[in-house]
Amino acid sequence: MNYNLENKMISRPTKDVYKDGDNTIKLFVENYSKCDILNEALIQARVEENTDLNIPLLREVTKINNKWAIVSEYIEGDTIEELMNKYPEKAGEYLNWFVDIQLTVLSREVPFLNRIKDKYSQRINQLTEISDAIRYELLQRLDSMPNHCKLCHGDFVPSNVVIEPDTNWAIIDWAHATQGNTSADAANTYLNFIIGNQEARAEEYLNIFAQKSGIDIHLIQKWIPIVAAVRLQKGKLEEKEILHRFVDVVDFS
């Protein structure tokens, strides 16, 4: 099938995202890992087939101009991030809605996804820019965390939640989904707000999430150094200083 690549929506170092009719085309750079692309498509398919969540339907994995592409259903609407920017006076209302949607996701289970503790352990062991003492403390803390099997999106941020014209919602970008601990997913969302220079919103989010979920904030905070280390392993230069603030601690009390 031929796709029209004139309407570029997003550009990233490793991929561009296009809209072509009712399709979203995620086109990766040449020589991008075939394993990673197929794994992303597999994750999306597993969530689609094993839950009742509204997510883009996976349509095909193909090659376009010698580059790998994932083609999915296009979801019409505004993201929660866009709505917050359009109507700042309603930001608190949208943030509460955002948390409700996240808790809906976390109430589901997809048993064939990778386990979050296995993924995080591998990433921390691969991280070269922390001391052995910090690595040991992080791995000990990770090992002590409860083994849960909740569906964790892994990149649950307002730009990945689309509110459709009929006010139904859909969740996009499932590349990082795993099964694991609710608090880990919340810690990841919190850290995303921090990295986006939204510290006040990060704290507001954390309080709302704790209140709605019934989880003690301290339990979520215990995951933050772990999640920061995992993100540090990705090697984004612009994030390193912030992430080290959370990782470079000895006493994780």
Give the ranges of each region predicted by the language model:
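Helix-rich C-terminal or lid/interface subdomains of diverse kinases
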Residues: 15, 188-253
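Conserved short submotifs of the Hanks-type protein kinase catalytic core
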Residues: 66-79
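Short beta-strand micro-motifs within the conserved protein kinase catalytic domain, predominantly
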Residues: 57-68
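Active-site acidic catalytic loop and adjacent metal/ATP-binding pocket
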Residues: 16-19, 140-184
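Internal "kinase-insert"/substrate-recognition segments embedded within catalytic cores
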Residues: 48, 89-116
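An alpha-helical support segment within catalytic cores of ATP-dependent transferases
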Residues: 107-154, 164, 245-253
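ATP-binding glycine-rich loop module of kinase domains
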Residues: 4-38, 45
